[in-house]
């Protein structure tokens, strides 16, 4: 009697449930480590953009006051007089309408209604300061 061993190819098998669970756990662990850093870097980028916009507008206000001998009446006047190309978008609120325009202090005895500008965003920056105080 001869024994014949057949060499049949077995069909390729998929991953086991345990292997899939282990891979998903590793992916979840890596995501939980990376996601907070990603969102923190997005927030830091928005804060940097806010500082840049505020500095640009404040420089334009000062230049307007030096040229005209008075402060502008609004941010729109800065754009109309070409001291800024256009009113920037507040990176924290995503709107051009949330800028807070501050009038000159009474002790300056200055004309014009726009002395400083701040963000209208609520909350605190990553360093703990209020956005309203920037």
Question: What is the meaning of each model-derived region?
Answer:
Residues 1-13:
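N-terminal leader/signal peptides at the extreme start of proteins
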Residues 37-54:
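Aliphatic-rich helix starts adjacent to a transmembrane/signal segment
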Residues 17-20, 30, 50, 54, ...:
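Generic leucine side-chain signal with a strong bias for well-ordered alpha-helical environments
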Residues 26, 46, 80-83:
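Amphipathic alpha-helical protein-protein interaction surfaces
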Residues 11-36:
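N-terminal single-pass transmembrane signal-anchor helix
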Residues 31, 43-46, 68:
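Flexible interhelical turns and helix-capping residues at alpha-helix boundaries
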